[in-house]
Amino acid sequence: MSATAPFKTLSAKAAFQLDQELMSTGEFSIDQLMELAGLAVAKTIYKEYPPNEATTTTKNKFNPNKVLVLVGPGNNGGDGLVAARHLKLWNYDPIIYYPKRPASNQLYSRLIKQLQDLNVPELTTLTEVKHLLDSRDSKIKIIIDSIFGFSFKPPIREPFKDLINYLGQNHDHLPPIVSVDIPSGWDVDEGPGTEIDIQASCLISLTAPKPCAKLFVNSGPDKIHYLGGRFINPRIAKEYGIEDIVNKYQGDELIVKL
């Protein structure tokens, strides 16, 4: 097991305050932040699991083409929808599962319409998800976990409890799971619970890593950790003590491997 990763983290409370500051004095809209976050997720997928290229992992070689995007009801889910749109344009074949949608929310309705215009298919039941992943000839090569973000508070409720439980129990035969900001079901500050535990292969921390990211990288020797969401100005970075992490970006990078 590797040593604790030397990077600054933001608690759930601090991450919430930072987001609020970005959207008040920072004058960012939620659309902008979601677009930048989703782009970072897509770029992480492209860099770590390139399309139509064999990638060596500890288990096998695979051609990462079809991507299953698991979409939650909040902003984390919106990041996943944005990522799916980019991946479709980059020669991946995303499929989304979006079982619980915000009522009458134009932002999410627009994101769904954009995916429909790109002919991105959608699964409507957990049975379909299980059938797709359990099938011997399943073509799914990557699972994007964009169910819950840093504002998640336990317990996990349906329609996500059975889904997350399935992912945790069947980890050994599932394709790599890439979690957005936190592995869904984990406590943002304390890490995995005792009942349900998604074992992600890759984590993309947005804005700055959360405390559970250190537990993630220390949970196995082959864990992959990226930082994305390059929209923090120097004043906010200093205020929250994350100058070092923000300064890891070089040139025109929108993501950086930690």
Curated annotation (Swiss-Prot):
It catalyses: (6R)-NADHX = (6S)-NADHX; (6R)-NADPHX = (6S)-NADPHX. Its cofactor is K(+). Its main location: cytoplasm. Its EC number is 5.1.99.6. It is found in: Cytoplasm; Mitochondrion. Binds 1 potassium ion per subunit. GO terms for molecular function: metal ion binding; NAD(P)HX epimerase activity; nucleotide binding. Keywords: Cytoplasm, Isomerase, Metal-binding, Mitochondrion, NAD, NADP, Nucleotide-binding, Potassium. GO terms for cellular component: mitochondrion. The keyword Isomerase applies. (6S)-NADPHX binds at N75, N76, G77, G78, D79, G149, F150, S151, F152, K153, P154, P155, D181. HAMAP family: NADHX_epimerase. NCBIfam families: yjeF_nterm (TIGR00197). Belongs to the NnrE/AIBP family. Catalyzes the epimerization of the S- and R-forms of NAD(P)HX, a damaged form of NAD(P)H that is a result of enzymatic or heat-dependent hydration. This is a prerequisite for the S-specific NAD(P)H-hydrate dehydratase to allow the repair of both epimers of NAD(P)HX. This is NAD(P)H-hydrate epimerase. The lineage of its organism: Eukaryota, Fungi, Dikarya, Ascomycota, Saccharomycotina.
